[in-house]
C-alpha cells in the first residue's frame, strides 16, 4: 500500500483534515454527508496504486473541526487544493460530496480533468413526492437531543435504503457507517451546516449540466431512494457524453457495499478518459 501522509489546512474558523497517498495524476475524493473520508477505505489501496489520491474530512466530520454554521463547501475544497498546489484533478464525490464536486467543476472547469458522481443530486434539483418518513422522525429526535436515534435513522435511510430491512444489509457496512456517523451527529453538522445553502452556486448545477466539459461518470445504487436514481438519470441525460453505471445490490454507498465492482468501474473509466 502506498505510504500516506496526513495534515490539516488552517482556515479562518478552524482546521480541515486531509490525507494524500500515491503518485501520478491526481484524484480527489469527497465523502457523503453522513459519514467521513474513511468511507473510501475500500478504495484506498486500489486507487493509490495508480494515482495520487487526496481525501479529506469536510468541516463537522471526522478529524476536521466542527462547522459552526452554513458553509460554502466549494470554497473549502478550493482552499484545500490551493494548499496542496493542485491545479487539475479528477473529482470523485459521493452524495453531498458529489454535489460539491459537480458545483466545483462548474465553477472551476479548468481544474476538472474528469468528474465522477455517485448517489448525488445536482444543486437546484427539485425532489418529487413525499420525503422519506425517517427525515421527519430524525428532526424530531434531534430536537429532543436523542443522538442515538438520529444516527439509527440516518443508517436506516441511507445504508439500508427503502427496499431492505437492516438484517438484509452487510452488518460490517452498517457498523462502519454508524461509527463514522457518530461525529457529525454529535456536532449537529447536518442541522447547523447542511440544511440551508450558503453562497450557493448561481445559477445552480441543474441549470448548467449541459455546459460540463469534463468526461463524466454518473453512478447510483439501484436500492437507493428513487429520487437519487432519478437525479442520476437527469444528470446522465443532460451532461454531454456522460457515462452511467448502476450498482444492482447497493443503496447509497455502492463503494462500501460493492467495492470490487466500484473500484473496477472507476479505474476503467479513468483509464479510458486519460
Per-range role (PLM):
Residues 240-274:
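Catalytic active-site module of serine/aspartate enzymes centered on a nucleophile-bearing elbow/loop
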Residues 91-93, 118:
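Short beta-strand immediately N-terminal to the catalytic nucleophile in serine-hydrolase-like folds
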Residues 103-107, 112-144:
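Flexible "cap/lid" loop of the alpha/beta hydrolase fold
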Residues 179-237, 246:
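Conserved serine/cysteine hydrolase catalytic core
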Residues 74-89:
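Conserved acidic catalytic loop of the alpha/beta-hydrolase fold
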Amino acid at each position: 500500500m502506498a505510504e500516506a501522509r496526513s495534515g490539516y489546512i488552517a482556515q479562518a474558523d478552524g482546521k480541515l483534515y486531509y490525507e494524500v497517498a500515491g503518485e501520478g495524476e491526481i484524484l480527489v475524493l469527497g465523502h457523503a454527508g453522513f459519514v467521513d473520508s474513511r468511507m473510501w477505505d475500500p478504495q484506498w489501496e486500489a486507487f493509490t496504486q495508480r494515482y495520487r489520491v487526496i481525501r479529506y474530512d469536510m468541516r463537522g466530520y471526522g478529524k476536521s473541526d466542527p462547522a459552526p454554521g452554513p458553509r460554502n463547501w466549494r470554497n473549502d475544497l478550493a482552499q484545500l487544493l490551493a494548499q496542496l498546489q493542485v491545479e487539475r484533478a479528477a473529482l470523485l464525490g459521493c452524495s453531498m460530496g458529489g454535489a460539491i464536486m459537480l458545483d466545483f467543476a462548474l465553477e472551476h472547469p479548468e481544474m476538472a480533468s474528469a468528474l465522477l458522481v455517485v448517489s448525488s443530486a445536482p444543486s437546484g434539483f427539485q425532489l418529487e413526492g413525499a420525503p422519506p418518513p425517517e427525515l421527519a422522525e430524525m428532526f424530531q429526535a434531534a430536537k429532543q437531543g436523542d443522538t442515538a436515534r438520529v444516527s439509527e435513522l440516518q443508517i436506516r435511510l441511507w445504508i439500508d435504503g427503502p427496499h431492505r430491512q437492516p438484517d438484509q444489509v452487510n452488518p460490517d457496512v452498517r457498523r462502519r457507517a454508524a461509527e463514522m456517523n457518530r461525529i457529525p451527529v454529535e456536532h449537529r453538522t447536518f442541522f447547523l451546516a447542511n440544511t440551508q445553502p450558503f453562497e450557493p452556486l448561481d445559477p445552480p448545477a441543474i441549470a448548467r449540466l449541459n455546459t460540463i466539459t469534463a468526461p463524466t461518470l454518473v453512478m447510483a445504487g439501484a436500492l437507493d431512494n428513487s429520487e437519487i436514481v432519478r437525479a442520476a438519470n437527469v444528470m446522465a441525460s443532460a451532461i454531454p457524453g456522460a457515462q452511467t453505471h448502476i450498482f444492482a445490490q447497493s443503496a447509497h454507498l455502492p463503494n462500501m457495499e460493492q467495492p470490487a465492482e466500484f473500484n473496477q468501474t472507476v479505474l476503467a473509466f479513468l483509464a479510458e478518459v486519460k
